């Protein structure tokens, strides 16, 4: 990620998803959490359906794989994930919610190991999982930034788990629908599920609610900027720089959320919050140590070297390099590289 356009796109995405947590915090002052999440995806679904129509994309599911993808994305990635996320954030600060959801790339490898037959987990990833979970413990213990609000952390962890399971299951589907069409379906199905869950919960009744202007602005901002704009920026970034570099946005988002929560909402950032986040970042680095080293190493003069091939090498000051179409051999991560670690959550 060296071009100015890629960096600006990365920053725009981090800001869109990072500020989402503050917008959720504002909206929760006037709206019950599950209803708020449902309304957010009402707005986003309308925008995505309009995009499908405007672009003339195929929207009708053609195969069983399409229907499976719609069900997985709608039920897990949108419905269950955001229900748990919004309920969890009603107990904790926006910064803590953002930090807990940054566990998604760390929890993906062990879940993928159970579901994807060719997926392999190496020892550093196991250590990374333990370190990342230790970060959650640091944040959640009484006397930390949550003041013992373990219920909120529990809901947030549930949101992370259903998102990871949904992402891995989606990886297994063979689908023909364009990504924008799939997103439109997922948001519409997810919104319907959220409305259903809200209707079944007595505390979620919208009868007699007074929607403050700030909550209305937060709702529109979440639907338009954070969801529609965020997904657009994410998939553009994914196409330009790949899944590994795009997934780093998960660790810029909590920084944005913490700064905005402190500046706009007066939230406190404690040493426990900072320490827990540092452990989660360290856990991510261990989970992705091969891929990160492959990309960062050459920039500092170290890192993996590609194996020489007879007749196709070039010697520069004693170092032999291969043609650009050669692979990294043992450093190729194979199946794991195709799993997208973007949360889209925020």
Walk through the language-model features, giving the residues of each.
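Hydrophobic transmembrane alpha-helices of multi-pass small-molecule transport proteins
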Residues: 121-142, 260, 272-291
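Transmembrane alpha-helices of multi-pass small-molecule transport proteins
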Residues: 30-80, 105-107, 111, 162-166, ...
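Helix-helix packing/entry segments at the starts of transmembrane helices
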Residues: 39, 97-103, 168-192, 223-263
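Specific transmembrane alpha-helical segments of multi-pass solute transporters/efflux pumps
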Residues: 16, 20, 49-101, 107, ...
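C-terminal transmembrane-helix exit sites in multi-pass transporters
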Residues: 105-130, 255-274
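Membrane-interface interhelical linkers
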Residues: 1-12, 45-72, 90, 118-126, ...
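Structural signature of hydrophobic alpha-helical transmembrane segments
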Residues: 31-46, 87-106, 149-163, 212-227, ...
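Hydrophobic/aromatic residues within transmembrane alpha-helices
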Residues: 27, 36, 40, 88, ...
């Amino acid at each position: 990620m060296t071009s100015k356009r890629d960096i600006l796109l990365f920053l725009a995405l981090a800001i869109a998803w990072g500020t989402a947590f503050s917008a959720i915090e504002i909206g929760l002052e006037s709206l019950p959490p599950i209803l708020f999440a449902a309304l957010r995806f009402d707005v986003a679904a309308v925008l995505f359906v309009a995009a499908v129509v405007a672009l003339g994309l195929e929207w009708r599911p053609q195969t069983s794989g399409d229907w499976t993808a719609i069900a997985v994305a709608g039920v897990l990635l949108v419905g269950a994930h955001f229900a748990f996320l919004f309920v969890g954030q009603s107990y904790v600060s926006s910064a803590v919610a953002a930090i807990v959801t940054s566990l998604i790339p760390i929890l993906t490898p062990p879940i993928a190991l159970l579901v994807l037959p060719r997926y392999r987990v190496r020892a550093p990833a196991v250590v990374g999982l333990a370190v990342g979970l230790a970060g959650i413990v640091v944040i959640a213990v009484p006397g930390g930034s949550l003041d013992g609000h373990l219920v909120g952390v529990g809901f947030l962890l549930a949101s992370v788990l259903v998102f990871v399971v949904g992402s891995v299951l989606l990886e297994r589907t063979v689908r023909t629908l364009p990504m924008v069409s799939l997103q439109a379906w997922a948001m519409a199905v997810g919104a319907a599920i959220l409305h259903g869950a809200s209707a079944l919960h007595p505390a979620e009744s919208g009868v007699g609610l007074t929607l403050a202007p700030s909550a209305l602005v937060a709702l529109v901002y979440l639907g338009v900027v954070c969801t529609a704009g965020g997904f657009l920026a994410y998939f553009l970034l994914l196409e330009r720089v790949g899944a590994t570099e795009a997934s780093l946005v998960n660790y810029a988002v909590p920084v944005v959320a913490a700064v905005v929560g402190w500046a706009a909402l007066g939230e406190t950032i404690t040493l426990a919050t900072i320490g827990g986040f540092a452990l989660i970042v360290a856990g991510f680095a261990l989970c992705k140590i091969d891929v990160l080293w492959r990309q960062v190493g050459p920039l500092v003069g170290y890192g993996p070297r590609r194996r020489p091939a007879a007749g196709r090498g070039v010697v520069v000051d004693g170092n032999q390099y291969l043609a650009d179409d050669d692979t990294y051999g043992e450093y190729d991560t194979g199946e794991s590289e195709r799993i997208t670690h973007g949360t889209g959550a925020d």
